C-alpha cells in the first residue's frame, strides 16, 4: 500500500535576499568573458528560454547563451515555484535584472563608439513591442527588462512606473505589481519609500506616460531597415 506523508513546514515570512549584495557577487563570479553578444542571446531568446524551463522539472539548469554558460535555479517549472532559492543563487528573473543593471553601468561609463555597439546588439522585446526604443532613454529602455525592479534606485523608479502605467491602461493585473512593491529603494524598505518617495514615483510615471506607446509586431531590425527609406514606425 502506498504511503502519503505530509508535514507542516513553517512559512518563510521574510526574505534575506539582498539584490545589491547578490549583484556584486554576480559581477565577481560570472562576468569574466561575458560579451554583449551573450547578453543579446538571453534577451532575444528570453521567451523561448522561459518556455523551455517551464517544461523541465530539473531544479538546477545550465543555460548556454552563445557559449557563455551560467547555472540557474529553475523556478519557472510550476512544481519548483515554492522551492527556496539561495541568496547567492541565480534564477532566470534575477539573471535578467542583473544583466540590465550591468548594461546600464557599462553605458554610463564607456566611450560613445562602445555605446553604439551596445545599443546595436541589445534588443528589448518587451519595450520594442510597445514602440519604446533606446531613443526614449537608456534607463527607461532597460527598465522594461524583467528583474530591473530589483534596482529601483538605479533605474529611477521606471520599472515601477511602467507597471503602474500598464495597470492604469488595463494592460496588466495589479497583482503583478506585488513583487516590485516589496523592493528596496536606495536601502529604504518599501514601507518607507512608499511614503517618502511619492514625488519621485510620480515624476517617473510622467515620463513613462509621455512615451510613444504603440503596439507593433515589427521588429527593431525591421524598423531600422524601413527608416532608411523614410518610413518610421
Curated annotation (Swiss-Prot):
It comes from the Viruses. The lineage of its organism: Viruses, Riboviria, Orthornavirae, Negarnaviricota, Polyploviricotina. Belongs to the orthobunyavirus nucleocapsid protein family. Pfam families: Bunya_nucleocap. RNA binds at residues 14-15, 18, 47, 50, 75, 81, 94, 123, 125, 128, 166, 176, 182-184, 217. Encapsidates the genome protecting it from nucleases. The encapsidated genomic RNA is termed the nucleocapsid (NC) and serves as template for transcription and replication. The NC have a helical organization. InterPro entries: Bunya_nucleocap (IPR001784), Bunya_nucleocap_C (IPR043011), Bunya_nucleocap_N (IPR043012). Gene3D superfamilies: 1.20.142.20, Bunyavirus nucleocapsid (N) protein, C-terminal domain. It is found in: Virion. The N-terminus and C-terminus are involved in homooligomerization and play an essential role in viral RNA synthesis. Signal peptide: none annotated. One of its GO terms (cellular component) is ribonucleoprotein complex. The keyword Nucleotide-binding does not apply. Homotetramer. Binds the viral genomic RNA. GO terms for molecular function: RNA binding. This is Nucleoprotein. Keywords: Capsid protein, Helical capsid protein, Ribonucleoprotein, RNA-binding, Viral nucleoprotein, Virion.
Amino acid at each position: 500500500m502506498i504511503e502519503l506523508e505530509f508535514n507542516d513546514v513553517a512559512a518563510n515570512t521574510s526574505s534575506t535576499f539582498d539584490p545589491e549584495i547578490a549583484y556584486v557577487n554576480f559581477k565577481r563570479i560570472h562576468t569574466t568573458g561575458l560579451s554583449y553578444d551573450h547578453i543579446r542571446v538571453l534577451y532575444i531568446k528570453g521567451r523561448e528560454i522561459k518556455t523551455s524551463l517551464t517544461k523541465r522539472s530539473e531544479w538546477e539548469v545550465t543555460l548556454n547563451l552563445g557559449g557563455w554558460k551560467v547555472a540557474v535555479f529553475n523556478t519557472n517549472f510550476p512544481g519548483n515555484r515554492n522551492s527556496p532559492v539561495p541568496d547567492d543563487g541565480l534564477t532566470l528573473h534575477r539573471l535578467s535584472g542583473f544583466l540590465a543593471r550591468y548594461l546600464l553601468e557599462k553605458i554610463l561609463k564607456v566611450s560613445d563608439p562602445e555605446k553604439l555597439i551596445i545599443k546595436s546588439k541589445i534588443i528589448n522585446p518587451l519595450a520594442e513591442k510597445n514602440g519604446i526604443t533606446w531613443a526614449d532613454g537608456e534607463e527607461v529602455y532597460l527598465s522594461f527588462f524583467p528583474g530591473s525592479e530589483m534596482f529601483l534606485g538605479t533605474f529611477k523608479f521606471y520599472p515601477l512606473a511602467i507597471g503602474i502605467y500598464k495597470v492604469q491602461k488595463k494592460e496588466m493585473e495589479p497583482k503583478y505589481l506585488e513583487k516590485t512593491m516589496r523592493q528596496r529603494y536606495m536601502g529604504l524598505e518599501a514601507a518607507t519609500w512608499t511614503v517618502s518617495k511619492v514625488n519621485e514615483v510620480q515624476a517617473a510615471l510622467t515620463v513613462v506616460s509621455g512615451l510613444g506607446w504603440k503596439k507593433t509586431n515589427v521588429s527593431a531590425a525591421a524598423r531600422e531597415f524601413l527608416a532608411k527609406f523614410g518610413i518610421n514606425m
